[in-house]
């Protein structure tokens, strides 16, 4: 019987990290280092706000872009910590996690045949997101001698006339590599020259706010 699913879905390999996660979840006294999540319960003040919202009946649809107050606070936080100003009405979209943001972002930017540059090792969802968006993932193999940081030379060598997006995790997942300001400035010049989108997977903002930011 022919598989009824789309070929691009069938061809996506399951996440190895998730396989280990499922195995460890059935074991007692095992510490999982598989998925990136805190090793403590959600703080009570956050849980209290969630409970309060439920009790106040805030359980209905919001704007497609997310709660107004949340989008405004996101802009305020980015402006305060990084000195960059965004318009909360037109430039901020709240998603259910970073993977959804990358998924819908690539779908919005890519046409069939466009290329998405993905430095690896990297988070397992980047490549499937590019494929599901109809794009072609192009892998840039990062080197240990460069501390797994993307270099300007590696980026330039990977760019073609079909290149549309560069995915740039900060810090790198799973290696933990952090791009220095000089690295980013060199890459920014190449990005500007070739007019390429950059999708920054900026997951751990609070943990690295003392360094030079993107």
Regions found by a protein language model. Name each.
Residues 1-8:
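Generic N-terminal amphipathic, Lys/Arg-enriched alpha-helix
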Residues 212-214:
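N-terminal low-complexity segments that are often proline-rich with Ser/Thr-Pro
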Residues 23, 189-190:
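Alpha-helical scaffold elements within enzyme catalytic domains, especially in hydrolases
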Residues 193-196:
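A short helix->loop->beta-strand "cap" motif at the edges of active sites that frequently abuts
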Residues 8-97, 104:
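N-terminal small-domain helix-loop-helix segment of the aminotransferase-like
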Residues 203-210:
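Conserved small/polar residues in nucleotide/adenosyl-binding loops
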Residues 58-189, 206:
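Conserved core of the PLP fold type I
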């Amino acid at each position: 019987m022919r598989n009824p699913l789309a070929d691009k879905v069938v061809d996506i390999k399951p996440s190895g990290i998730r396989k280990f996660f499922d195995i460890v979840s059935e074991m007692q006294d095992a510490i999982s280092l598989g998925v990136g999540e805190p090793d403590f319960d959600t703080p009570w003040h956050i849980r209290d706000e969630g409970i309060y919202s439920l009790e106040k009946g805030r359980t209905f649809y919001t704007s497609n872009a997310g709660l107004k107050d949340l989008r405004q606070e996101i802009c305020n936080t980015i402006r305060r910590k990084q000195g960059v100003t965004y318009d909360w009405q037109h430039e901020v979209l709240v998603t259910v996690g970073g993977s959804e943001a990358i998924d819908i972002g690539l779908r919005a930017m890519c046409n069939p045949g466009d290329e998405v540059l993905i430095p690896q090792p990297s988070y397992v969802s980047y490549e499937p997101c590019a494929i599901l968006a109809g794009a072609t993932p192009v892998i840039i193999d990062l080197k240990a001698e460069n501390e797994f940081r993307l270099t300007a030379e590696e980026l330039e060598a990977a760019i073609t006339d079909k290149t549309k997006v560069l995915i740039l995790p900060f810090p790198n997942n799973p290696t933990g590599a952090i791009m220095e300001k000089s690295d980013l400035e060199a890459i920014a010049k190449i990005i500007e020259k070739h007019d390429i989108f950059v999708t920054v997977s900026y997951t751990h903002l609070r943990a690295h706010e003392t360094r030079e930011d993107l």
